[in-house]
């Protein structure tokens, strides 16, 4: 019985690690999309930047882009 508990614990830990890896991949993908839009991912945009949203990473939820002068 103790062997089965150890295996269950390791499988559970592996699933948690896999979930973290897939979240990191999507955050990197969204950061690349923001880069293509000539923006960058930040927690807060500066006053002369516009929030376009889209990064959705835990620490950097916004894609900030410079405002265009009209």
From Swiss-Prot:
Function recorded in the entry: Has antibacterial activity.
Pfam families xref list: Defensin_beta_2
Signal peptide annotation: 1-26
GO CC entries: extracellular region
Name under which the protein is recorded: Beta-defensin 107A
Keyword list, A-Z: Antibiotic, Antimicrobial, Defensin, Disulfide bond, Secreted, Signal
Family statement drawn from the similarity comment of this UniProt entry: Belongs to the beta-defensin family.
Organism listed in the record: Pan troglodytes (Chimpanzee)
Protein localization: Secreted
Cysteines engaged in disulfide bonds, as pairs: 41-55, 45-64
One GO BP: defense response to bacterium
Keyword Hydrolase among UniProt keywords: no
């Amino acid at each position: 019985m103790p062997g089965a508990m150890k295996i269950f614990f390791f499988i559970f830990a592996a699933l948690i690690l896999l979930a973290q890896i897939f979240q990191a991949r999507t955050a990197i993908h969204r950061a690349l999309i923001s880069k293509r839009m000539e923006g960058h991912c930040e927690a807060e945009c500066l006053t002369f930047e516009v929030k376009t949203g889209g990064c959705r990473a835990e620490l950097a939820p916004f894609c900030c882009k410079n405002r265009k002068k009209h």
